[in-house]
């Protein structure tokens, strides 16, 4: 075997070994999300001293990295999350990823709702709590969000509140927010996906303020337009107009098909 061929074999072998070593010692995992249209997440990653470390790091030297901070204009669904890092000589490990779920519902800057989800990371976890990965190295946790609507102000502008709950493997809603937990040793090189669905129907934020009718809901008048709560109290005949995001005046939400003059 000539020298050139031996050199090629040696270089190829070293590259293969280095590649495998790098794969086995990955110091990050991929966080991604499958979200409804007009949804985006912001991720903040928090680190704590590794188990056995006696050191502490001032907050100013251990700031939480953020992904998708400019979620309206520069949103990217994939984020590479560092698992271990060193600050001031102290070995740190990821403790949790706090997730803001933002969703736009209207044309104005303030026409958006926000909810929260979380990925927790521990050195050890009970098997019943620890999320698992499939053969492709992917793990998914799911949730469902629903819009809750109400009116604010004397003109009764529609505003919405985003309510998100975790769903189990069968799609049933749970009481907690979307959440998943992993151990440090199972994360390197893996992918964690947050999958969120949007409920087909919206519902009133407060009970006894709207009446269900064909095409949607009618807003109870209460004591008048200045009555911010305007509970129905059994009066299902006197209703008010309200203003949709964007200013349209309507009598039925969300199936508004006509403009109405405001009557006081």
What is the predicted function of each stretch?
Residues 29-40:
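Structural motif
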